[in-house]
Swiss-Prot record:
Entries under Pfam families matching the protein: Ribonuc_red_sm
Molecular function per GO: metal ion binding; oxidoreductase activity
NCBIfam families recorded: PRK08326.1-2, PRK08326.1-3, PRK08326.1-4
Enzyme Commission number: 1.-.-.-
Cross-link (3-(O4'-tyrosyl)-valine (Val-Tyr)): V71-Y162
Domain of life: Bacteria
Cofactor: binding details: Binds 1 Fe cation per subunit.
Binding site for Mn(2+): E68, E101, H104
Annotated CDD domains: RNRR2_Rv0233_like
Binding site for Fe cation: E101, E167, E202, H205
Native source organism of the sequence: Mycolicibacterium gilvum (strain PYR-GCK) (Mycobacterium gilvum (strain PYR-GCK))
Protein name from the UniProt record: R2-like ligand binding oxidase
Enzyme superclass (EC): oxidoreductase
InterPro entries according to UniProt: Ferritin-like_SF, R2LOX, RNR-like, RNR_small_fam
Amino acid sequence: MNRTRSDSLAAGGLNWDSLPLRLFAGGNAKFWDPADIDFSRDRADWESLSTMERDWATRLCAEFIAGEEAVTQDIQPFMAAMRAEGRLGDEMYLTQFAFEEAKHTQVFRMWLDAVGITEDLQGYLDDLPAYRQMFYEELPASLDALATDPSPQAQVRASVTYNHVIEGMMALTGYYAWHRICVDRHILPGMQELVRRIGDDERRHMAWGTFTCRRHVAADDANWTVFEDRMNELIPLALQNTDDAFALYDEIPFGLTIEEFQQYAADKGMRRFGTISSARGRPLAEIDVDYTPLHLEDSFADEDRKALAASA
């Protein structure tokens, strides 16, 4: 595609108050280096766990690192879709988004190395059919589709798949599991810091996905149906992944229950409908500077902090 102009040279410059560029600035301000996280105490804590506890936590970590790797590889077409739409601010933010996903892959691998897990972990995913369908089929298919069809409808489907269901349900539920394991027992301080850092990054990722869907729903109400249909298609798959993981164990370690995690995941998924619905009929100019998507993710984080503090 030939370049005909540079948006950064346009009269008035860039709108730094637009949500994508606010997210971009936030990522710059909160930059962190995986090499700065101290994993030195985690090895002893890890070895103090029972064999079943280590197996459960290894599977959880395998799900995370494979997911981070998948998004690092699959997110590129969304950048191209933003370029095709002429949205430089979104394209700038997505370059940061992709970098952060690569960094998340790095830091989970560093943690595995630090606690001495160096064997092939692929088998931990072979037992999770819903996970494999989500990450091996639904995610690449929905994002790859943007390479040939960058339409609003395709963008909404891709955003629902990754930002709302994978990040907004599955990953949030996984972070909650790590908090329950680590905070309740006062163990694995390196993992606690890792999850805190990644969670902060991914709140911005989810906010961008919510913003993107709200933008398209405000522009064309037919996109609300696209959002609803894709959410209703994938939410059962996300909940099935929790069932699959818990079903592998006769006794669930760490005092966790499947009911707690199913309720947690379902709550995070269902509350996203209202935030998208609130954009219907709104002027696009308002949506661009409406920080509701970020406030939603911050409220989820605040609720988790309070719940975990109460259980500690």
